[in-house]
Amino acid sequence: MQTLQLVILFALFLLTVWLFFLNSRANHPSWAALEHRRYAHRGLHCSADSVPENSLAAFRRAIRHGYGAELDVHLLRDGTLAVFHDSDLKRMTGVTGVLEDCTAQDLAALHLASTPETIPQLCEVLSLYEGTGLPLVVELK
């Protein structure tokens, strides 16, 4: 019985510490810039309009609507940063392969969801958002 009480006490201690750190981060002033904004997850994509996720067209569309964006970034074999959600190319390009094994030149030949859109580099998306005042949330994969 005493062992169970110690385990429960330790779990409560860990929970208290975790909540303290979580709460202190959530109230940090730097988060205020991200609050009360609309974000387009992987850009403002729409398959009905042939605007695939994580494409420059999707990010342009998000900007036109005043949305910030969440995007995923992978490091390619040649050191280039590519904006793409999956590690596997198949779902969005129809090509079998692993994104991280490619170079920027390899990706330039692939089209997203049977559209003319290609997999953008991070620098291209940053250029689109430069000067807009809209936030980007970048997830490193």
Q: Which stretches of residues belong to each language-model region?
A:
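Phosphate-group recognition and catalysis centered on beta-loop-alpha active-site segments
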Residues: 2-141
